[in-house]
Amino acid sequence: MSQLLTSRQAEELHKGIIAYLTSVNLHHSSAALREELGDSIRVDDTTLKKYEGLLEKKWTSVVRLQKKIMDLEARCASLQSELDTATPTSLNRKNQDPVSWLPRAPARHDLESHRSPVSCLAFHPIFSSLASGSDDTTIKIWDWELGELERTIKGHTRAVLDVDYGGPRGGTLLASCSSDLTIKLWDPADEYKNIRTLPGHDHSVSAVRFIPSGAAGSPMSGNLLVSASRDLTLRIWDVTTGYCVKSMQGHGDWIRDVTPSPDGRFLFSGGDDRVARLWDISSGDTKSTFLGHEHYIECVAFAPPTSYPHFAALAGLKKPPPASSSAEFVATGSRDKTIRLWDTRGNCIKTLVGHDNWVRSLVFHPGGKYLLSVSDDKTLRCWDLTQECKCVRTIVAHGHFISSLRWAPPLVKDAGANEGANGTEAASNGAKEDATKMSIRCVLATGSVDLKVRVFAA
């Protein structure tokens, strides 16, 4: 066997081993090693003190270097992927069109403070605030432009499973839900004071979303909130009173996700029964069911009206539905590693294959051309609806499972009013506007089991 160490390095290693064995009270082992080495090495109390902790330091430094190498390799792979798909236009950042902007590595900010996996994210509809929820029971508020932690919110007693900004006209609130069976409302204008707790669900509350203004002609513009739970129900709440105004049943197992349509007339949900459902909010009835996934449905999304022309081409329609239509196309992501695109009658238009593990979250680009997804395979993928849903960019975004993905909602006129603040659609009045008339914010965030939130921005 070839000698890898010089005689001096071998001597230092032996002294380090003896010092370590002595420090952990393995005196017999230490004495045996000294006897084996004989006169080739001399160890006294001064030597033991000098070499104490040496092995631990070298071990931890090796682990740190290995992690750094893995991060650099992942970043190189991501950059190579971008180069492979780059065009002269995409390389010119100065002339970037927000409608075509896609995230690229590295992230602008790595936000670290959570002590357990990050489970959910939400952008403030106007300001540069980003909320993150975690299994550590806390919600953290970050300034995503500066990359700084603003505050930590405590109140839930178990894992926080979802967060969302929205609320009554002129008064944005933050909603959160948890495995502790409750929904909590927080007031950003009053230092995120907990203004209301909504009990009622009989099991973990897995998703919460504000319903955009004017749902089904309701006079309670912006006052409505929908929640999904492991108790197999969807519940609609009036946030001004705290009362549950409607409970909807139909799923046969845990409801993992729910999202409202841009005009607030419909809900789309999915869960462990492998069925997605489209609901009419005003009647509480299921309008359509979506069958085809072979495992639990983890995430659902409504396609924005800006994407209708691309969906129409995929579906073989002669002309797209009008942009004023409330809910024409949807997407689902599953543990079967696929994403499915549907019309709202329940017909599967396209199945997107590429992820190597559970698909955990979906978001449509506000410009309508792309669908973005994150997965337990640690990647963020961008799918081009104009190229038969080809995956045009893959970013290794985290070192562990990616649990959440949110896009900062576009700024629209009358931004002080309630907006579809879930990061996947604009306000109901903004949904009718062309993408070029919206102020698209080229900012998105991902959250991971690696305890990090990453912000990607132009």
Swiss-Prot record:
Residues 60-87 form a coiled coil. One of its GO terms (cellular component) is transferase complex. It comes from the Eukaryota. SUPFAM superfamilies: Lissencephaly-1 protein (Lis-1, PAF-AH alpha) N-terminal domain, WD40 repeat-like. WD repeats lie at residues 113-154, 156-196, 200-247, 250-289, 292-353, 354-393, 397-439, 441-458. Pfam families: LisH_PAC1, WD40. GO terms for molecular function: dynein complex binding. Disulfide bonds: none annotated. The keyword Cytoplasm applies. InterPro entries: Dynein_regulator_LIS1, G-protein_beta_WD-40_rep, LIS1_N, PAC1-like_LisH-like_dom, WD40/YVTN_repeat-like_dom_sf, WD40_repeat_CS, WD40_repeat_dom_sf, WD40_rpt. Keywords: Cell cycle, Cell division, Coiled coil, Cytoplasm, Cytoskeleton, Microtubule, Mitosis, Repeat, Transport, WD repeat. It is found in: Cytoplasm, Cytoskeleton; Cytoplasm, Cytoskeleton, Spindle pole. Residues 9-41 form the LisH domain. Self-associates. Interacts with nudE and dynein. PANTHER family: WD REPEAT DOMAIN 5B, WD40 REPEAT PROTEIN. Belongs to the WD repeat LIS1/nudF family. This is Nuclear distribution protein nudF 1. The lineage of its organism: Eukaryota, Fungi, Dikarya, Ascomycota, Pezizomycotina. The gene is nudF-1.
